[in-house]
Amino acid sequence: MKQNILKKYTELSQKSHLHFAQQVEEYLTTPEEETEDGSNVIDLPFPGNATYNFNTRLKDEDMQPLSISFMSYVSNIRHIDLSYNMLTDKGIAILSKLLEYAENIQTLNLKGNKIGDAGCESLSKALKNKAKLSYFNINTNVFGNLGLMSINELLYKNEALKCLNVGCNKYDWDGIISITSALKTTNTNLEVLNMDDPEYKIQDQHFFAHFGKMFLSNTGLKKLSLRLHMIRWEAVKILFHHLRNNATLLVLDLSGNQICFQSMIYVLDYLSKKSVLRSLNLSRNKLYDHGVKLLGEGLKTNTSLEYLDVTSNKVTDVGFVEFGMRLMENTTLKALKCFWENSWGNKSIKVFNDYLAMKGKEFYPDFTIFEDEQHELNIAYLETHMPNEEDYLVE
């Protein structure tokens, strides 16, 4: 199968006077792959950010010979990774003709290209009703509201879709509301959603009520990332108020927002009640000392949170003392990230040294505390990873 595809691809590339993509040849000369039932499978694993692909990233003109070459074996395609290439709507229109017949496709990664609204429309039409498509990543492209609305159609048509990454594009609330509406009324199958860094024309905190209402009725979503949404205290109040009635969301990433210490009273209220969140990322916000004090207060009685990130919040020695003393009463936290872009002092280092001794070996902080040559306690960064850490993060 691979030999036949390579022969066809070579002929078409030479005929079109195109640069021969070395990564395509290398993949097609590797041994055939088989599924458990013995059938052959074929992938398109050509990410442009791989070291050996960087200088031969795929362009629109490469899609024609590539798509035609694979068309004879389109039913064998399972995974396509064309991330970090140079594809625009023109190249995506050609790829979509292949995708239309790829009935067994399971994952599609188009992150880091230049796909606009028209490309999203082509993809939506080609991918609708694909019964095995479970993962779709179109992060870091250039589409806006119309493109996101086209992608949103997959939430109504593709029941197998579990992970959707549409972050870092140019949509605003019109596009976002189309997604939250689908998850509020129809779709209960999607488990992971990344909507990082939209391009707001108007930022009204009350629009986050659309996420809140989604929390009330959605029973499928387990992971949500809302990095870089300019979230302030009003939105925090809305989100955590509605989260109290949600029993399925386990991982929430709110890093890189404008969450201030006043917001933490609502987080405290949520955490101190019957919460289910297992992972909360509040890094790169504005919690300061009082914010982590309130956060620690909520964690005193919390029994669900296992992963917490509060790096880059300008916490000082005073705040860490208050935070650490409250963490002493928590029994479930397994991983704590708080070293970078905060300020430690002798008192807080002593408190956290006692905290680490209490937690024991099955704890994964991003710091270590040691005794220096002057027999004084000091702190340093330590990279640690808890088992199955990917379960606590959003891609």
Segments (PLM) and residue ranges:
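Leucine-rich tandem repeat or coiled-coil scaffolds
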Residues: 1-395
